[in-house]
């Protein structure tokens, strides 16, 4: 006997149109813009084939420059060349002057106490400066992508407060950008490495840039990143490595720079040397009239105190997060200064695991933001194409006997909605448990449990009288909504699930293969379970009838004969012979036919008792 009545399915299928979206790493020193193109995420390059755009704006009376050309003006016109506006955004003037007393700008407070920077174009707020950088990045993106952007994801430090985040949004909106989301920089880096769809656990993001160091401790649970703690050092970065190396070179050469030009030349040499030592064990040096060399070991010794400072901040962040080092499952490296081999080695030793370094640390945040932007704008991410375009595994529901009734079959295109109707199994039943399952097997024990919920408030009726409509709906993002509704009262309950969460492509494939290799055995098990359900139903009905009317209409011999057949079915039901159970159900049905007729007659007699003939006619 069928437990479900399949209603006419309703199905929708709105095709996706690719929209242009980018991820922006709005950095303190440099900014980057990235996008997903032809299913590949990549950083967009400027006219000089550079990915890094200096976060610098230079103002003249009638124009402004952004990026490299603006940075080139810093030495000649520092008061009109705004560098590191990110440090100022969302802060009060008093806070800015306390934190950064040596900035070369002329400040004035706005009406609400925020800093305004005097330039040749008048006073500029950090929001306006950031807006000019974002406008430049937007123009670059629209040139490279040959179209108008539908939205952007902008990254911010995890420690940014509400004012700093809102100011960043305001800067974007000032130039007409549709901000899909502000994304924490460490989260973006983790997304770039695909950690959002992998294992759950604690992730450390070690971000050593040019001027600052940030450490973030994240917990990934059910695809959601939670920031447990942040820390760092705003006066520690790759620039400090350069200054130490420059001082060492000047000491070795016994030459001190005489002016700003020579100082810049020395720092440039130090930077080039640092980069060279990331590739080689030793490199030659030439400064003024001096020639020498430096080994990687010597360089490591120079920067060791600075690296130790960063690890102290890491230990403090772990303590703040109440996390032991052993709990950290992945370490992500961000920032150009993490290219230094000694930094990678020290971080690896500290966390007792090899850090993730396969993605360019300068680009990793922008790449993660681009992946998120592509998802939020409505496009399909590479690693979820199968899971989002079609239902990868059938979605079903548990029925009596531990069976699975498939409601949305595997490979159904999404979005989709389908419904089936249940009925109650027992007299007076007022609640129904809904068990949502995923998989291709026939039995509940062999499928993946997604969720359970209970529909309450079903009006008490005889078994089979109530109708409960269960609707499964999968939207374009792969989110499954299940709703159960009793049709007469409209009382309902529902739940939302992400069926694709926690399953890799390999696991999906294995589940499909398992269903194929076990198809015959599964079908036999299903048929056996179905016969057991039918047997339970028959036994329950006969027992209730015997208890109510058996002694009134049956002789002892007739009563005993039915009990014998019923006991036989109970014993066979415990076995595995499906055919024998099926035959025993028929035997019990045959043995109770006369009893059913006598019960019918008894009911008629009771209905007619005390009534005159003319009342019946």
From Swiss-Prot:
Family matches, as SUPFAM superfamilies: Actin-like ATPase domain, Heat shock protein 70kD (HSP70), C-terminal subdomain, Heat shock protein 70kD (HSP70), peptide-binding domain
SS bond list: none
Keyword annotations of the record: ATP-binding, Chaperone, Nucleotide-binding
GO biological process, one term: iron-sulfur cluster assembly
GO molecular function annotations of the record: ATP binding; ATP hydrolysis activity; ATP-dependent protein folding chaperone; unfolded protein binding
Gene3D superfamilies reported in the protein's UniProt record: 1.20.1270.10, 3.30.420.40, Actin, Chain A, domain 4, Substrate Binding Domain Of DNAk, Chain A, domain 1
InterPro entries in alphabetical order: ATPase_NBD, Heat_shock_70_CS, HscA_NBD, HSP70_C_sf, HSP70_peptide-bd_sf, Hsp_70_fam, ISC_FeS_clus_asmbl_HscA
Record flagged with keyword Amino-acid biosynthesis: no
Pfam families: HSP70
Signal peptide: none
Entry annotated with the keyword Chaperone: yes
NCBIfam families: HscA (TIGR01991), PRK05183.1 (NF003520)
Family stated for the protein in its record: Belongs to the heat shock protein 70 family.
Described purpose of this protein according to its UniProt entry: Chaperone involved in the maturation of iron-sulfur cluster-containing proteins. Has a low intrinsic ATPase activity which is markedly stimulated by HscB.
Protein known as: Chaperone protein HscA homolog
């Amino acid at each position: 006997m069928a437990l479900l009545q399949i209603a006419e399915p309703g199905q929708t299928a709105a095709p996706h149109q690719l929209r242009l979206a980018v991820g922006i790493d709005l950095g303190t020193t440099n900014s980057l813009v990235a996008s997903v193109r032809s299913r590949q995420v990549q950083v967009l390059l400027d006219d000089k084939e550079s990915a890094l755009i200096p976060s610098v704006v230079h103002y003249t009376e009638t124009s402004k420059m952004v990026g490299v050309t603006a940075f080139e003006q810093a030495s000649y016109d520092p008061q009109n060349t705004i560098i590191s506006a990110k440090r100022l955004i969302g802060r009060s003037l008093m806070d800015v002057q306390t934190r950064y007393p040596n900035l070369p700008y002329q400040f004035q407070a706005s009406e609400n106490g925020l800093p305004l920077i005097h330039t040749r174009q008048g006073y500029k707020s950090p929001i306006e400066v950031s807006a000019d950088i974002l406008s430049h990045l937007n123009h670059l993106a629209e040139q490279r992508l040959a179209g108008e952007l539908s939205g952007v994801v902008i990254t911010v430090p995890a420690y940014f407060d509400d004012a700093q985040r809102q100011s960043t949004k305001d800067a974007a909106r000032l130039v007409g950008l549709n901000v899909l989301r502000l994304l924490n920089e460490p989260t973006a880096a983790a997304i770039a490495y695909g950690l959002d769809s992998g294992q759950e656990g604690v992730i450390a993001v070690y971000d050593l840039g040019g001027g600052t160091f940030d450490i973030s401790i994240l917990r990934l649970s059910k695809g959601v990143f939670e920031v447990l703690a942040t820390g760092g050092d705003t006066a520690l970065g790759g620039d400090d490595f350069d200054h130490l190396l420059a001082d060492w070179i000047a000491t070795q050469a016994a030459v001190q720079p005489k002016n700003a030009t020579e100082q810049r030349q020395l720092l440039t040499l130090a930077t080039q040397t640092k980069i060279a030592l990331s590739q080689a064990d030793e490199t030659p040096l030439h400064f003024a009239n001096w020639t020498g060399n430096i080994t990687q070991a010597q360089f490591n010794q120079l920067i060791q105190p600075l690296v130790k400072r960063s690890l102290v901040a890491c230990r403090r962040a772990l303590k703040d997060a109440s996390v032991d080092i052993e709990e950290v499952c992945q370490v992500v490296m961000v920032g150009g200064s993490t290219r230094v081999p000694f930094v990678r080695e020290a971080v690896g030793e500290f966390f007792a695991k090899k850090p993730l370094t396969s993605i360019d640390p300068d680009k990793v945040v922008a790449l993660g933001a681009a992946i998120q932007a592509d998802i939020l704008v409505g496009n399909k991410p590479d690693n979820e194409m199968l899971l989002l375009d079609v239902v990868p595994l059938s979605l079903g529901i548990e029925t009596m006997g531990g069976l699975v009734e498939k409601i949305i079959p595997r490979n159904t295109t999404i979005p989709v909605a389908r419904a089936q109707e249940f009925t109650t199994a027992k007299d007076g039943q007022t609640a129904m448990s809904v068990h949502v399952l995923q998989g291709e097997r026939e039995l509940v024990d062999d499928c993946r449990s997604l969720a359970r919920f209970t529909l309450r408030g079903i009006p008490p009726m005889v078994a089979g009288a109530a109708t409960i409509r269960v609707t499964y709906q999968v939207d374009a993002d792969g989110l499954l909504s299940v709703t159960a509704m009793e049709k007469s009262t409209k009382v309902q309950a529902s739940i939302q699930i992400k069926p694709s969460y926690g399953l890799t492509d390999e696991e999906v494939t294995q589940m499909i293969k398992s269903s194929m290799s076990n198809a015959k055995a599964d079908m036999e098990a299903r048929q056996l379970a179905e016969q057991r359900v039918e047997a339970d139903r028959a036994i329950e009905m006969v027992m209730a009838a015997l208890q109510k009317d058996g002694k009134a209409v049956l002789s002892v011999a007739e009563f005993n004969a039915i009990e014998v057949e019923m006991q036989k079915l109970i014993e066979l039901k415990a076995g595995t012979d499906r055919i024998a159970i099926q035959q025993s159900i028929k035997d019990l049905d045959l043995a109770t036919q006369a009893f059913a007729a006598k019960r019918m007659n008894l009911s008629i007699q009771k209905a007619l008792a005390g009534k005159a003939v003319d009342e019946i006619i």
